[in-house]
């Protein structure tokens, strides 16, 4: 049948045939056979090389307000092109349906009973749809804002360490009163959508879980970390173990609250280690080999012959961690050595405080008396044997109010009044006030966050040298007492017998000598040998010359890195502006060996001051009225240095109360 049809050549085939024909003419070969061959070959090649045809671009249709008479409005959802939405069934059609014929067909087939409805009818339907859309979006926004507000209030309550019921009984009612007064009742009603009642506790637990997950995720990445731990007994007679962690993260060290453990069984080293193992390895899935430092006090619970918690922890770290005895605890132990005569003065001062503070009537009478004569202070401070270094403040208050206390004791006919009539006793009290204030100041310098071992060692060594200097001053022919301002003022304002003053000077000299010996015992020089060998960590730019670097016992690669680092003026500027830990974290890419060695030296804690702070907050939270409170979640939120990711928390479904 093919011979009955006339086949037309494609344009490309015609052009190709003409080209072949012209080439044949130019070559002088013109015959029908060549033309047929060329044509056949052209047909074969044309089947394998199809020409490219451009598709016709279809433009998107736009919505027209006249389409409302067919019952369609423009859909408010964020589509790429305009799409019609039926005001009756709310169906959304494709962009291609934006034709009057297709829209009319939808109305006739789906809603035939509404064909004769006037335009006003569809306008009312359009208005109803817009109102419902606005209501839903507004309700969603209010619900999300209410949920976020609930989280923020719970976070603030936990950070301020106040009772959870304060949010429901004080904060929310107060906010309602303020908004209702300043704005109107309608605005105040929006606050009622904020979840309340018992929701604050649930929100705090959720935030605590979120913060814990954030911290553990970081530690599970295999980074090095160090811990400090301490145990104490709260008001509910529950033994509590607090653990803090310091880890290298991004461009510096971070310190955070790791865990809060209740030790329910009898307190022993095995109990503490078992609970730690269960939490750190069992629950958190952390590797003890990444622990590079352990810091605790020197109590028998931690380091005793039978418990040996520290020994067990060092074993599970394969001795890859170092143990540091808390500097503050060691200073407190060293400060307890006092000669007998000075100890008697201290005991009598404590008796005076207990006589007045032990009776509410005596305390009120002294307060009234001090207020009437206009003293700067009206109360005495309690003496606690555990907080040994707080005696600086206690003795300072007694010495400041010595005349008022003397008059009060005479009125009370107490035998303790006679000690204030003894100039020798008052002079010794002035010295004890000064020396304990100095020790208390040293203790405060050893506390705080982000302190390194070099700073603490420098302060301890500086104090030991100061003690030696004071001894030399007192041994001279013309002794100087400038270092004890209250003592110096007292002997200048009062006539003190020269022989008595010499006796007091000998007792002071004996006390300073005893302090030097105890500080040398608790802070031996051999413990600081590692720091002296790695003094380049403290100041790497002090070793610019090769001769000084050779004496540091570094491997050749480390020597080369230190020489290159100390020659960089740009890094010297960073060293002067950044903290020591931040500086070594910054150069870890360029000087990995030195950075790694420095981080391992700086990472361990030097004190357990963070644990002490945690116990103070625990005392604030767990009052006598709330002695059965489980403070784990609140402690996490109150002490964590991580900031919650509110967007992640908001992804949880809101359930307004």
From Swiss-Prot:
InterPro entries (alphabetical): RNaseH-like_sf
Top-level taxon in the UniProt lineage: Eukaryota
SUPFAM superfamilies according to UniProt: Ribonuclease H-like
Family: Belongs to the FAM200 family.
PANTHER family named in the record: EPM2A-INTERACTING PROTEIN 1 (PTHR45913), LOW QUALITY PROTEIN: ZINC FINGER BED DOMAIN-CONTAINING PROTEIN 5-LIKE (PTHR45913:SF19)
Name of the protein this chain belongs to: Protein FAM200B
Organism: Homo sapiens (Human)
């Amino acid at each position: 049948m093919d011979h009955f049809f006339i086949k037309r050549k494609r344009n490309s085939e015609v052009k190709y045939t003409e080209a072949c024909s012209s080439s044949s003419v130019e070559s002088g070969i013109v015959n029908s056979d060549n033309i047929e061959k060329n044509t056949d070959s052209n047909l074969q090649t044309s089947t394998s090389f199809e020409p490219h045809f451009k598709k016709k671009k279809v433009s998107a249709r736009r919505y027209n307000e006249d389409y409302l008479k067919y019952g369609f409005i423009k859909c408010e959802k964020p589509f790429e092109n305009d799409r019609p939405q039926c005001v009756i069934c709310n169906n959304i059609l494709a962009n291609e349906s934006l034709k009057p014929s297709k829209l009319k067909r939808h109305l006739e087939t789906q809603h035939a009973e509404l064909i004769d409805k006037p335009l006003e009818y569809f306008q009312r339907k359009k208005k109803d749809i817009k109102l419902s859309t606005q209501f839903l979006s507004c309700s969603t926004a209010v619900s999300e804002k209410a949920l976020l507000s609930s989280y923020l209030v719970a976070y603030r309550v936990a950070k301020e360490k106040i009772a959870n019921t304060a949010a429901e009984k004080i904060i929310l009612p107060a906010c309602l009163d303020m908004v209702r007064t300043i704005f109107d009742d309608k605005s105040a009603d929006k606050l009622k959508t904020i979840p309340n009642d018992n929701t604050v506790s649930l929100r705090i637990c959720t935030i605590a879980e979120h913060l814990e997950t954030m911290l553990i995720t970081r530690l599970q990445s295999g980074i090095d970390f160090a811990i400090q731990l301490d145990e104490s007994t709260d008001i509910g007679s529950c033994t509590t173990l607090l653990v803090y962690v310091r880890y290298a993260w991004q461009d510096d060290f971070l310190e955070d609250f790791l865990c809060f453990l209740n030790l329910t069984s009898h307190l022993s080293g095995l109990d503490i280690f078992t609970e730690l193992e269960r939490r750190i390895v069992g629950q958190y899935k952390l590797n003890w080999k990444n622990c590079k430092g352990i810091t605790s006090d020197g109590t028998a619970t931690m380091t005793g012959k039978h418990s040996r918690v520290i020994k067990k922890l060092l074993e599970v770290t394969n001795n890859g961690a170092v143990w540091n005895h808390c500097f503050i605890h060691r200073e407190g132990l060293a400060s307890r050595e006092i000669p007998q005569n000075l100890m008697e003065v201290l005991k009598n001062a404590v008796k005076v405080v207990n006589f007045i503070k032990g009776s509410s009537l005596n305390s009120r009478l002294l307060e009234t008396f001090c207020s009437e004569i206009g003293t700067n202070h009206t109360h005495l401070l309690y003496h606690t044997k555990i907080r040994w270094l707080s005696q600086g403040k206690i003795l300072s208050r007694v010495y400041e109010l010595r005349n008022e206390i003397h008059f009060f004791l005479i009125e009370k006919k107490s035998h303790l009044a006679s000690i204030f009539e003894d100039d020798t006793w008052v002079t010794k009290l002035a010295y004890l006030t000064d020396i304990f204030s100095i020790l208390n100041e040293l203790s405060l310098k050893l506390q705080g966050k982000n302190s390194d071992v070099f700073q603490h060692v420098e302060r301890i060594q500086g104090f030991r040298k100061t003690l030696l200097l004071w001894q030399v001053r007192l041994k001279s022919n013309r002794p100087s007492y400038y270092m004890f301002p209250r003592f110096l003022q007292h002997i200048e304002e009062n006539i003190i017998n020269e022989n008595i003053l010499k006796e007091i000077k000998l007792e002071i000299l004996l006390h300073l000598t005893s302090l030097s010996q105890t500080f040398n015992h608790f802070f031996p020089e051999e413990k600081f040998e590692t720091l002296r060998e790695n003094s380049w960590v403290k100041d790497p730019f002090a070793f610019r010359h090769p001769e000084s670097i050779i004496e540091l016992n570094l491997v050749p690669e480390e020597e080369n890195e230190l020489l290159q680092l100390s020659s960089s003026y740009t890094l010297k500027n960073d060293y002067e502006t950044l903290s020591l830990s931040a500086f070594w974290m910054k150069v870890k890419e360029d000087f990995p060996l030195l950075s790694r060695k420095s981080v391992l030296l700086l990472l361990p804690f030097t004190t357990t001051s963070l644990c002490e702070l945690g116990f103070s907050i625990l005392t604030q939270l767990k009052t006598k009225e709330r002695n059965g409170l489980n403070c784990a979640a609140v402690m996490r939120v109150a002490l964590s240095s991580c900031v919650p990711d509110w967007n992640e928390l908001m992804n949880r479904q809101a359930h307004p109360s």
